[in-house]
């Protein structure tokens, strides 16, 4: 496995429901609320009295289920669903989840959000023992581990399998008589439990999906925890005691929808606090604040309230383009920036603009937006980022594969400022980020994973370790 060339990272959305006669349709609505987490493919798997049925395909959820018959056939009171964005594997339906596994004595489905850091080693070992993989993502590994376990009970098999996989993961599994969800020992990826008026139980990557189907949040799944949902109700269990909360800080910064709550913290509120703290750390004179739509608008509001500068709509987003960070190729990302934003000359002309954005990954978007604002007549553009400098890869489930593609890993703040063409560049401090999010916990770093900013990973990197250490010695120039 070569870390620089290929990673298995995914950023996806998972949803499941047990105990509702329209389970698949509600899963469709739930996935619609999670569409921002992945647009490459989607699928739904239903349970109709023990019979598992599935439809999946490439594209947006609405495209996958454009024919109503594909959803109508997914009858039953239980269902799981998945929206996918991935860097692993070919762009084919084989990699679209949920996966469905049929054996002579059982069948089950699986949906996964995250990335396994020991996937290559596990896959090699399993293949040497005769396992045959039908997809190229790491999500299939858990099913093989479950099936090959010698533990006599199903829960014993699942616990054993979960203890063998490492990294970041949120799994939802659908069996003939139950739905099971599990979270990694650090809770890198969020997973919440909700309940509907009729007693149906819902599991989702984000709480925003509960609102659209009328479910009430019960609680978030804890690190290392398993929830078993069947006709008898809800049962919580764990597969390890070696846990420590380190939820991905990028969920609060960028990925999650503003109306979602993660570990008791509303995402919009956290972003506003990030913006306010950013304003306190900002040291330049300016006339107006312009937030980059849409994920930066909450931070811009906080910046405005703290700084006293007026908030202006200096950038307009075409709502029918996809998010550039989760476009699968760099060429598409650059095209996406050109398509999705335009500057309002009547607002920014002759003004010193504070451009508030959530993050700088490759610098593609920032450079283009600064150019747009200056072409529209802004006299100065001061870029203020509502997160620390993103200088290290993520191995737990985000498409940040290598240091070579991170501008902050290869250039100083001043060099980055020059590359994007800004008059100044200010990043939020790591301490400011942790304080702004404010999870109530005594875990290190306020219960957050901030390894993308300081390189201090909360777990061993396993298969990635050797190549990652080597990459620390390499540099890539972003100057053009």
Q: Model regions: which residues?
A:
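Generic beta-strand/beta-sheet core signal
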Residues: 111, 174, 182-183, 194, ...
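Phosphate/diphosphate-binding loops
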Residues: 160, 208-209, 216-217, 221-225, ...
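Short, glycine/charge-rich flexible loops or terminal/linker lids adjacent to PRPP-binding catalytic cores
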Residues: 308-353, 364, 391-401
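Secondary-structure transition/capping motifs at alpha-helix termini
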Residues: 131, 151-152, 283-287, 305-312, ...
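Flexible loop/turn segments at secondary-structure boundaries
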Residues: 22-24, 87-88, 118, 188-189, ...
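PRPP-dependent phosphoribosyltransferase catalytic core
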Residues: 162, 177-178, 214-220, 314, ...
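Conserved short alpha-helical segments that host acidic/polar catalytic motifs at enzyme active sites
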Residues: 1-223, 228-286, 292, 380
């Amino acid at each position: 496995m070569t870390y620089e060339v290929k990673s298995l990272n995914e950023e996806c959305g998972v949803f499941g429901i047990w105990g509702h006669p329209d389970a698949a349709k509600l899963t469709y609505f739930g996935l619609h609320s999670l569409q921002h987490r992945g647009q490459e493919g989607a699928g739904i798997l239903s349970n109709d009295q023990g019979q598992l049925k599935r439809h999946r395909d490439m594209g947006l959820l609405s495209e996958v289920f454009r024919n109503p018959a594909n959803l109508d056939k997914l009858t039953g009171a239980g269902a799981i669903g998945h929206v996918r964005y991935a860097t692993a594997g070919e762009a084919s339906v084989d990699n679209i989840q949920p996966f469905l596994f049929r054996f002579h004595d059982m069948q089950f489905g699986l949906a996964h959000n995250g990335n396994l850091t020991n996937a290559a080693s596990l896959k090699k070992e399993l293949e040497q023992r005769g396992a045959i993989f039908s997809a190229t993502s790491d999500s299939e590994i858990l099913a093989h581990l479950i099936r090959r376990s010698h533990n006599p009970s199903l829960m014993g098999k699942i616990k054993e399998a979960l203890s063998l996989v490492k990294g970041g993961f949120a799994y939802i599994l659908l069996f003939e008589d139950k739905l099971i969800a599990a979270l990694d020992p650090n809770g890198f990826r969020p997973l919440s439990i909700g309940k509907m008026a009729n007693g149906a139980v819902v599991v989702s990557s984000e709480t925003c999906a509960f609102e659209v189907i009328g479910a009430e949040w019960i609680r978030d799944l804890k690190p290392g925890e398993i929830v078993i949902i069947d006709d008898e109700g809800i049962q919580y269990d764990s597969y390890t005691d070696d846990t420590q909360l380190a939820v991905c800080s990028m969920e609060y910064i960028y990925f999650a929808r503003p109306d979602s709550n993660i570990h008791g913290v509303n995402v919009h509120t956290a972003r506003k606090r990030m913006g306010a703290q950013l304003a306190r750390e900002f040291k330049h004179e300016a006339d107006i604040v312009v937030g980059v739509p849409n994920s930066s608008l909450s931070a811009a509001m906080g910046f405005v309230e703290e700084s006293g500068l007026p908030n202006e709509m200096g950038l307009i987003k075409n709502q029918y383009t996809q998010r550039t960070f989760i476009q699968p190729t760099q060429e598409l990302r650059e095209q996406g920036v050109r398509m999705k934003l335009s500057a309002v000359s009547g607002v920014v002309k002759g003004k010193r603009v504070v451009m508030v954005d959530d993050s700088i990954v490759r610098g593609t978007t920032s450079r283009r937006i600064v150019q747009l604002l200056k072409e529209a007549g802004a006299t100065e553009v001061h870029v203020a980022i509502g997160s620390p400098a993103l200088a290290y890869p993520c191995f737990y489930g985000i498409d940040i594969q290598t240091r070579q593609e991170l501008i902050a890993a290869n250039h100083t703040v001043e060099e980055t400022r020059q590359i994007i063409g800004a008059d100044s560049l200010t990043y939020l401090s790591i301490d400011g980020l942790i304080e702004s999010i404010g999870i109530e916990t005594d875990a290190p770093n306020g219960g957050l994973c901030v390894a993308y900013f300081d390189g201090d990973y909360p777990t061993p990197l396993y298969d990635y370790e050797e190549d990652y250490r080597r990459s620390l010695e390499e540099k890539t120039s972003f100057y053009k």
